[in-house]
Amino acid sequence: MLISHSDLNQQLKSAGIGFNATELHGFLSGLLCGGLKDQSWLPLLYQFSNDNHAYPTALVQPVTELYEKISQTLSDVEGFTFGLGLTEDENVFAQADSLSDWANQFLLGLGLAQPELAKEKGEIGEAVDDLQDICQLGYNEDDNEEELAEALEEIIEYVRTIAMLFYSHFNEGEIESKPVLH
């Protein structure tokens, strides 16, 4: 069974890891969407979240399971089951911060997997620009929470779509297609 967001957060914090669960999800998603297919994800994760030190053994299994779950949901394009792994906190401001954290780490992972990402044009280039804007997502504490929640919901759906766009672009031939039943 996949570890909960809050349990993973606690384990990462206890181990002194530089990512929270949302940032970890974003980073791993970025690597996968960028087409990384080998085991180099683990050394990259250690390098960027723990000063090149391996994670404690007890943390490697849940992180590996998360990586595999993200990979599975990304490859299920038709089911569109990919989620962003944002905070479980229902506060809209915490959700907005979580989305910004996720997008920042997603771009880092994507850029590591695709070093020439800045040269991309067309819809991929536009999607990168949009994600960079989302990383700068801001709000005022006195913003209308209901309006912010609605806007955030739309942005989250857009980011899910962007992630799938990157995945299908950089992982051609890896997409799971289900047979059409007549």
Curated annotation (Swiss-Prot):
It comes from the Bacteria. One of its GO terms (cellular component) is cytosol. InterPro entries: YgfB-like (IPR011978), YgfB-like_sf (IPR036255). Pfam families: UPF0149 (PF03695). Belongs to the UPF0149 family. This is UPF0149 protein CGSHiEE_07975.
